[in-house]
Swiss-Prot record:
GO BP: Mo-molybdopterin cofactor biosynthetic process
Lineage: Bacteria, Bacillati, Bacillota, Bacilli, Bacillales
Gene source species: Staphylococcus carnosus (strain TM300)
Catalysed reaction, written as an equation: 2 [molybdopterin-synthase sulfur-carrier protein]-C-terminal-Gly-aminoethanethioate + cyclic pyranopterin phosphate + H2O = molybdopterin + 2 [molybdopterin-synthase sulfur-carrier protein]-C-terminal Gly-Gly + 2 H(+)
Name of the featured protein: Molybdopterin synthase catalytic subunit
Enzyme Commission code: 2.8.1.12
InterPro entries from the UniProt entry: MoaE_sf, Mopterin_biosynth_MoaE
Length: 150
């Protein structure tokens, strides 16, 4: 197990949480993002994730560095799963510990937002009647809407 990694097997929640444990930390916040069945009114059968693994792991570590700069004293572990995932499977886990809970919560939320912005991970949504590759986790359509280009 690495502190920041891309995996193909189910995510081991306790291992990544335990990585952040430290006698000086008073709070550990663990976020797990799961495959949901419904997105924008469309029923999802499953998802498939792909990543450029060396760059994705580098970007996950970069996010960890950003968190350590903004919230000194935090310890971060981030793992994202790739390959086919069923409904309710864990796709991403972020564990952040800090001396106090406020920083752990804020850093954890920052991490998931940054993952969606900078980590080269793509997902394919498979529905009952079709499929679509999403350019990155926020999706090209959402980016175009935000820029007024839809």
């Amino acid at each position: 197990m690495k502190q920041f990694e891309i995996v193909t097997e189910p995510i081991q929640t306790e291992q990544h949480r335990d990585f952040t444990l430290n006698p000086h930390q008073g709070a550990v916040v663990v976020f797990t993002g799961h495959v949901r069945e419904w997105t924008k009114g469309i029923r999802t059968e499953h998802l498939e994730y792909e990543a450029y693994i060396p760059m994705a792991e580098k970007k996950l570590a970069q996010i960890g560095d950003e968190i350590n700069e903004q919230w000194p004293g935090t310890i971060v572990s981030i793992v994202h799963r790739i390959g086919p995932l069923k409904i309710s499977d864990i796709a991403v886990l972020i564990a952040v510990s800090s001396p106090h809970r406020k920083d752990a919560y804020a850093a954890n939320e920052y991490a998931i937002d940054r993952i969606k912005e900078v980590v080269p991970i793509w997902k394919k949504e498979i529905w009952e009647d079709g499929a679509e590759w999403i350019g990155h986790q926020r999706g090209y359509h959402d980016d175009a809407v935000e820029r007024g280009q839809n």
